[in-house]
Structures are given as C-alpha cells and as structure tokens.
Amino acid sequence: MSYDLATAERAAYAPFFGYMGAASAQIFTVLGAAYGTAKSAVGISSMGVMRPELIMKSVIPVIMAGIIGIYGLVVAMVLRGKVTSASAGYTLDKGFAHLAAGLTCGLCGLGAGYAIGIVGDAGVRGTAQQPRLFVGMILILIFSEVLGLYGMIVALILGTS
C-alpha cells in the first residue's frame, strides 16, 4: 500500500473542523453578546431608579451587544454552506481554515461583547450623573463594536478563500 498525499489531505474527519469553526463562531459571539447585554442592563436598571427619563436613551449598549451575536450567525451560516463531505473534496486545509475563521469571529465577538458590557455599564451610570458623558460613551461603544466587525471581516475572508 503506497502513501498518497491527496488521499491523506481528504481525511474523513476534515469536515469536523469546519463544523467546529461554524459552531465556535456562533457560540463565542453569543456568549459575548449575552455578557454585554447583561452587564449593560444592570447599569440601566440601577440608573433607572435615579433617572427614569434616561432609560430609552441608555438602551444603546444593549442593542450594540445584540448585534455582536448577528455577526457570529452570519459567519456560521457562511461556513456551514462551505463545508462538504470529505469524499466530495473537502480537505484538511479547508477544515482548518474554517476553524480559524470561526475562532477569529467568535473570540473577537467575545472580546467586543465584554468591552461593550463594561463600557455600557459604566457609561450609563456616568451619563445619569453627568449627561455630557453620553457622546464619549457612544464613541467608545462604537470602537468596541468595531472589534467584532473586524473579526467578522477576517473570518469571511478566511472562510471564503
């Protein structure tokens, strides 16, 4: 029996890595979104006791945290569409590329969700005491959101090439 490199690259377990990439993109981004939502909501709840008129204005961090989960959903669906069976030509390098794409999107989303949660909590509480802090909070939230967006862009490049 001879060793054939083309057959070795089409290992039967190669699609497992592709599916793990899709799963990790969804799981980690949703964990980040959940943390960001929960942490920001705690700040909104405590701020709402003192200044209930600012509650609707302070919902922005919660919305931005929810968008992080959508990034993971988009990447997971793109990766899911690219994974085929090993007999159809799905190789290990494609599987590892899809795993890297999923981890990139997922971990960037996790970090972005943490950042949005911390900034949202502190920013909402600070805005209740000093309304001029609102613009600064929004700017920092945008920079935090962009971390997740960068992860999605890199994941889409990795997953489709």
Curated annotation (Swiss-Prot):
Pfam families: ATP-synt_C. Residues 1-15, 80-98, 159-161 are lumenal. Keywords: Hydrogen ion transport, Ion transport, Membrane, Transmembrane, Transmembrane helix, Transport. InterPro entries: ATPase_proteolipid_c-like_dom (IPR002379), ATPase_proteolipid_csu (IPR000245), ATPase_proteolipid_su_C_euk (IPR011555), F/V-ATP_Csub_sf (IPR035921). The chain crosses the membrane at residues 16-36, 59-79, 99-119, 138-158. Residues 37-58, 120-137 are cytoplasmic. It is found in: Membrane. Its main location: membrane. Proton-conducting pore forming subunit of the V0 complex of vacuolar(H+)-ATPase (V-ATPase), a multisubunit enzyme composed of a peripheral complex (V1) that hydrolyzes ATP and a membrane integral complex (V0) that translocates protons. V-ATPase is responsible for acidifying and maintaining the pH of intracellular compartments and in some cell types, is targeted to the plasma membrane, where it is responsible for acidifying the extracellular environment. V-ATPase is a heteromultimeric enzyme made up of two complexes: the ATP-hydrolytic V1 complex and the proton translocation V0 complex. The V1 complex consists of three catalytic AB heterodimers that form a heterohexamer, three peripheral stalks each consisting of EG heterodimers, one central rotor including subunits D and F, and the regulatory subunits C and H. The proton translocation complex V0 consists of the proton transport subunit a, a ring of proteolipid subunits c9c'', rotary subunit d, subunits e and f, and the accessory subunits vah-19/Ac45 and vah-20/PRR. Belongs to the V-ATPase proteolipid subunit family. This is V-type proton ATPase 16 kDa proteolipid subunit c. It comes from Ascaris suum (Pig roundworm).
